[in-house]
Amino acid sequence: MDDSTDDDSYHPRKHYAYDRQVSSSRWRTSREYIRGPGPETHTTESAQDGQDPPAGVYSYGYFSGSGNDPQVQGHFVPEIQKYNPYVIFKGEQLPVPIWELPEEKVQDFHDRYFIAKDKSRVEARKTLNRLLEGNINTIERGHGYKFNIPKYTDNMEFNEEVKVSLAKAGKTISRSFCNANQREVASRTGYTIDLIERTLGAGLNISKRTVLYTNKDLFGDQSKSDQAINDICALTNIRRGSLGIIAAEKGIVVGNIFLELTNGKSISCSIGVQIPHRLDQIKDVCVEIGSRNIEYILVVEKHTMLNYLLEMDYHTNNNCIILTGCGMPTLQTRDFLRFLKQRTGLPVFGLCDPDPEGISILATYARGSCNSAYDNFNISVPSICWVGLSSSDMIKLNLSETNYSRLSREDKTMLKNLWQDDLSDVWKRRIEEMISFDKKASFEAIHSLGFDYFATNLLPDMINKVREGYVQVQEKKEPQDTEASED
């Protein structure tokens, strides 16, 4: 599954937060950098005004007051750099964060795989013009468009270094107007290239839904216009956002943080806000003044989960950021999660229903999807840990049989396909348990034990169990020095 089902008609409940002007003088006197979970501060010349800390090394927050003895208001507690058995990948070799790869290594990935890049609108438009101009001769001869598009949906491999599924370079598929079987798809591709080029030239963005309705007779339905957009991203090696294509964003983020924008304003996330379309307009992510340390990011499968946790004030009581894609996440939601992970260094935990679709959604955040294979490198978060809910979690609760439904044939096929991947032992075991249990459920069934039970008891316990996974591996990997203990 992927994000191709984005629909502009979908409107989840929106929590609008206020914009406020952040005083530049307050920002200059209060911004400091923190290393690790302790209160150690760094005020060296390398942490000058407006300069971001090195990615993956520092976390940062707000302090009240000024001078040499600031009071900590709260900061981001970075993830322990140890393997956790609840991640999706097998083996204890940690993935190298994409943003920490040296430039020559990134180039090596681009040579070996089809990976889309961020480009300026001017560069993107020039690339599209070259594609159109390259077809002028064939069009004049009456042959129409012809494009050789990289194969990405069925030409993927799992890269062990970054723990992400990527599309291998070297294979292409033809879209030719001369071929009767390819004529329609070639026409859709050529039309969409021209549409995007004109939109970029006008300095505008266009939604995926609008692309469909600019020529409904040509596309027919959303899946075909989405395919044309994805093909163009692969053909040009340009990311969708750089082409001015936006989807109806349904993702929401909640937490005692605010997003500092490049225009000097900020957006509070304390009561929930829709995920911004343009990450390039976010300058920083900061802890709200007066808030405690933020300890982790919790990704939840669906809108009802987020509404429930928001009602229980879970993000404040448990010092976390909550994010949902309201089902299968869009590219923007996945990119925003990667952005939060990169900027904060926080561990990421995933919560889903005990059903095949929930597992597939978490796997998409971690590894990516086939339809976005050209962008998986940029937006995947392989370190996400599957907190629950699993079949064994539900069995232990002794819920009534009326809370379950049988797995369908499609459910079993999805589980078997997931199981065949090279997954960690925990993921494999949980999938096997679900197949054996032959039932699925929804987290709402747990409310029969009390409305607040899940938020105040079960979920914190499950997260603590996953967090202990780091410690267990650490003790296993680093036994105590016997000579030192004798001293």
UniProtKB/Swiss-Prot annotation:
All copies of domain Topo IIA-type catalytic, residue ranges: 119-252
Region named Disordered: 1-56
Superkingdom of origin organism: Eukaryota
Cofactor(s) needed: Mg(2+)
GO terms under cellular component: nuclear chromosome
Residues that coordinate or bind Mg(2+): E301, D353
Family annotation (InterPro entries): Spo11/TopoVI_A (IPR002815), Spo11/TopoVI_A_N (IPR013049), Spo11/TopoVI_A_sf (IPR036078), TopoVI_A (IPR004085), TOPRIM_Topo6A/Spo11 (IPR034136), WH-like_DNA-bd_sf (IPR036388)
Quaternary structure (record): Homodimer. Interacts with TOP6B.
Functional description taken from the UniProt entry: Required for meiotic recombination. Mediates DNA cleavage that forms the double-strand breaks (DSB) that initiate meiotic recombination. Possesses double-stranded DNA cleavage activity in vitro.
Misc remark: Plants silencing TPO6A1 are sterile due to defect in male meiosis.
Name this protein carries in UniProt: Meiotic recombination protein SPO11-4
Organism annotation: Oryza sativa subsp. japonica
Species classification: Eukaryota, Viridiplantae, Streptophyta, Embryophyta, Tracheophyta
